[in-house]
Amino acid sequence: YKMNKYNTNHTFAVCAYKESPYLEECIRSLKAQTVQTNIGIYTSTPNDHIQSIADRYDVPVYVNPDAGKGIQADWNFAYNSADTDYVTVAHQDDTYEPGYVETLLSSVKRYEDWSMYYTDYTPIKDGDSSRRDVNSRIRRFLRWPVKNTAKADSIRRKKLSLCMGNTIVCPLVTYNKGRLGDTVFTSEYNFNLDWDTFYKLAC
């Protein structure tokens, strides 16, 4: 496989575990992007299920040679292995709207010093993603400090948007690896390590 088929400077690094029934739907949503981009599957649990889906959609699979060290190590393996400046660490049970990459590439052109890009989300329930649940509403409300784009680069505002909990959904984040370097996940936590990462980046 040639890792970078597209010159978007972006990769969807899909973290796959065991035999998820949602992995194929996730990959389909990435293949359906209005701007085609690079996709790779990264796993510590290689199996026929993952490989068959990868073969079906012509997506390369990368196996973590240092498996068994936890989710943070798996995320860093996927992030570090992606050979582009922009990396979205996608989770196997999430899907993306077709315009995610197009909007990303358009948005980041306006900011030379960006480190992290993220979007809103809605949960999928019984195949329906048109309705917000309570968690989605609360998270959206708590992000109010950074809704004013003219002031969103304020450290105080970024920290304020995270001080009541994790208001950002991890799979919808794209990291500017060209700015952040390797191994972006350095949390000492076993849980909420994504929130800890976002808070560190906010500082």
Which role fits each region the language model picked out?
Residues Y1-S29:
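N-proximal low-complexity "stem/linker" segments adjacent to membrane-targeting elements
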Residues Y42-Q51:
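A conserved acidic beta->alpha catalytic loop
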Residues V87:
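Short aromatic/hydrophobic "clamp" motif used to bind/position activated sugar donors
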Residues G99-I138:
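Conserved donor NDP-sugar-binding/catalytic core segment of glycosyltransferases
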